[in-house]
Amino acid sequence: MKKYLVTGAAGFIGANFVKYILKKWNNEVEIIILDDLTYAGNLMTIKDEIEQDNVTFIKGDIGNRELVTDIIATHNPHYIVNFAAESHVDRSITNPRLFLETNILGTQNLLDCARNAWFEGKDANGKNIYKEGHKFLQISTDEVYGSLAKDFDSAQPLLVTDDVKQVIEGRDNLKTFGTQFFTESTPLAPRSPYSAAKTGADLITLAYHETYGMPINITRCSNNYGPYHFPEKLIPLIIKNILEGKNLPVYGQGENVRDWLYVEDHAKAIDMVLHNGKVGEVYNIGGFNEEQNIDIVKTVISIIARIMREEPQYQALLTCKVEDINEGLITFVTDRPGHDMRYAIDPTKIAVELGWYPETPFSIGIEKTIRWYLDNQEWVKSVTSGDYQKYYEQMYHNRQ
């Protein structure tokens, strides 16, 4: 039985990964969840999973050396998958120290505890030997690469290599807003305290591989969307505000471009890297879904308005009239400091080496996401506490 220590699994991507692994492997795996349950982590997200006999939940900080050492000694996980991180750019601007402590020092503590537990001696050449079948996977972001140019005002056809065409199985109508893309060899150039902290975590992970020979991988993903996304992020924030009849805040003119990846596709990629990724390698995970922020907002407005008209049972969720759900709700607010113009991942490496591709087109994934939020308002209410309301006012009220 393979054992996974998954940190930050009460958060968005970590929770979806745990759900994916349990669905795929059922009782053939054991999962230990370590989560400090900060603002973006909520036990309701994994309430069904932690009731299973093969799942153990532990509340705690990844920076707690004694706790992490004890967990690894007790459970002897084959894989450590580190999702635990402070992960919102706006919050990093107001409190950068917290991001450095959690994202860099917390990651280093996990690495050190794993290194001590998995070390088995040295080979004839003096190289460290670690327990067979063990691996540390650092979950990172495309934001470590900085910003790309937006070369086109409107989307243009995205051309992919013949190798990738053989993998993506019929995904067509791919588009792009630029001529350059992040690859695994793109120089790291973070532009916010959040991305700088994630860069530091990546570098210390790579250093543990180069210095100590630790078995590691790093994955860097584009923007995720899907169920259980905390409502400070763009898509769930827009959904929530539409239902509440609030304005829809959009930074600048909404021209910034992101590559959107459905979270279940991301979970599948992580699983493939864990089992088949070459030790020491970095893998970019992208969605082939470049969209401008303003177009995301308009799409969400259009879908919710259609659902409300065609399926009136959902109108009970509204605090406004159906006819008020329109683009007039959009409010352009002062742009974020250092707002990166465009992110775009080139996932050729993981496609060619591991056979992974993002199966979910944005047109399908966004409707699934919206319907999940409409059907799970109890979860939304459970995570939007008074602290969330104070944060929302701080971020958007004075920027209009």
Where are these regions (language model features)?
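N-terminal Rossmann-like NAD(P)+-binding domain of SDR-like oxidoreductases, especially those catalyzing
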Residues: 1-224, 264, 274, 341-342, ...
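Short histidine/acidic/glycine/proline-rich micro-motifs that form metal-
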Residues: 37, 98, 223-226, 256-257, ...
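C-terminal substrate-binding subdomain of Rossmann-fold SDR/epimerase-dehydratase oxidoreductases
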Residues: 16-20, 25, 31, 60-63, ...
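A glycine/serine/threonine-rich, flexible loop-to-helix segment
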Residues: 49, 151-153, 231-239
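Active-site helix-initiating loop/hinge in glycosyltransferases
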Residues: 226, 230, 259-262
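Amphipathic alpha-helical recognition patches that constitute DNA-binding helices
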Residues: 8, 12, 135, 192, ...
